[in-house]
Every structure is written in C-alpha cells, then in structure tokens.
Amino acid sequence: MKFAPCLALQVAAAAVALTSAAFAAEGLKLVRLANPVGGHIHPAACVSAKGTLVVTYGHVNHRDLRLTRSTDGGATWSEPKPFAPTVGKTYYPGSLTTLRDGRLLHAWNRWSEPTNEKEPRSVLYSLSSDDGLTWSEPKPFPRDEKIVSNIRHPIVELTSNQWLLSLSDKTQVFDPTTGASQPFGDGRAHGLVPIVRTPKGSFISGTGLRSTDVGKTWQAIAPFPNLKEQGWRHEMVCLANGWLIASEILGPGVGGERIRYVLSRDDGVTWGEVFEYYNPGRAIGGRACPRTVELGGGNIGVVFYDVEPKQAGGPGLFFLKLSVDRLGREAKIRSSN
C-alpha cells in the first residue's frame, strides 16, 4: 500500500531569509521552512541520491508529523504536509536515512497503541523510492513489548541487509529481509546516541567511544562532546572527506544561547575545534535538535528549530547552508565557552 501526500508548489515566499545579524556566522542565510505549533518538534533530515532534501518534524506535539522537501539545495521548500503513515495516529519523532540503493528510510516512534501517548514506545519504519513523495506500509523493528525502545538518529547501512540501529534500549544489527536482529560488536547498548562509520571503517559512538574492529572493542575518546546526556537532542555526522562534526549547545536554560559544531579531522580521535553557526543574541526557544546533512558541491545544511515567539515570524523551523571549506577554514580552537 502506498501513501501519497498532496504535492505542493515550492514558493520562495514561504522560505523567509533572515539577515546575518541574527546569528554569529557572517554571510549565512537562515531560511524558514516551517512554522511548528510546538511540543516535540525534533526534525529529521536526509538528502536523496537526486539531491532532494527531505525533512520531517513535529508540527503539533505527538499528533501531526509533517514532511517538507526542497529540490534547490534548501533555498525554497514545499508546503509541509502530514506524513501519511501517521495521519490519525500518535507518534514521537524519529530519523531519516538515505540508503545506498537510493531509497529513503524514515523510522519513527509509536506509542503503546495507535492513538494514545502511553509507554512503552517502539519503532516503525517506512521506505520511499520517489524522494519522499510516497511511502511504503510501515513495518516494526524487533521489540520487547515491555520495554521502551526509541530511535532519533540515522541508521548505519553496513550492507544492504544489515542496518545498524542505535536504539534507546539496545544497539542492534537488523536484517530487513528477514526481520531478525542481533547485537552489534561486543553486544553493549550504547543508548539513544548517534553512531557513525568513517571512510576508514572506524565506528564513533556518541557515548565517547571509538572502535576500529567493527565494534568488537572500544576505546574512550577524551575530551569528547557531551552527546550522551541528551542523546535524543544532539547529533554527530561523518562527512565524505572524513571529518566528523557533533553538535554543542551552550548557555543556560532549556535551549541555551548558541549552537556550534565540534570538529574532528583525524577519524574521531581528537575533537579540538569548533564553529559557531547560530547565536540569536538571546535564549533559544526550545531544544533546537539540529540535524545536519551533506548537500554535495562542497556544502552541508543544518535544520533546527527556535520557538521564541517574539522573533520575526514567530516560532520557526530553520535551514542553514554552509560550505565545508568555510567550516574547516574558520573553525577555532575549542574552549569551554
């Protein structure tokens, strides 16, 4: 069964570009791609083989999960539409991944029943073969019905039939052809943190661990960005050139005041540089939950939210495009602030 959301015209007027005065990195354009109502907005993002940007986010807390697309590198976005497999059902936001064969994988969290908001949650996934226009019938990942199991980060595609899942309750290798799963590496549960594989074959865990033997043994990384304390919120991404970037949000309160990348250029061994890309000069509204994708052409893009009601346009979900060259050139030595 296919779910086909209504197609919407991309209109530049819907994506409001703000001036660089709104954030720290001069010359960057902040694009508004949606106006979420509130709650767990927690976006997910991926880029298709054709270059289409696909973003999902919570428009209404646990009740209205929406999807928007961009075919011009994030300059304009389609009108956000409800994600068809969750219409009329409750959800908790998940992740997006582009598979090697070009399909998009969207994994999200369901509650104990289709329309309630009670634990234990578990994970469903759906696939798209047309850049996010239509989606397959949802299927579940293996679960223990008595244990909460959540996903918030992209999977790692080890092979076409081996997906590494970083779930809140376990770290598993899932076979989509059989529906079976098995523990990854030494069997430890890393928790709800990102895990990435580098071009050299190393695995970096958001718990601050690094493995060069496919997870059989792990070595501690210190210092390392504090991803594990709020693993659902933060991100870690490996770029095509081998650099790794992780999110860091500084400042008091729920949302902090500044968002920056922490950069590793040596396969995840050291994390000594930072690049700040968002600083509105006030408290950020909400957790931001940044999600970064590599766009091609030497660029990356990051999606995050700021629901401060007094900002121009009110609460918003935003997109920011940045060149990898600039990231590397302007990164500064990391300090505690």
Residue ranges and their predicted role:
Residues 1-12:
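Bacterial N-terminal signal peptides that target proteins for export
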Residues 20-24:
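Sec/Tat signal peptide C-region and signal peptidase I cleavage site
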Residues 25-337:
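Asp-box/BNR beta-propeller blade signature and adjacent active/binding-site loops
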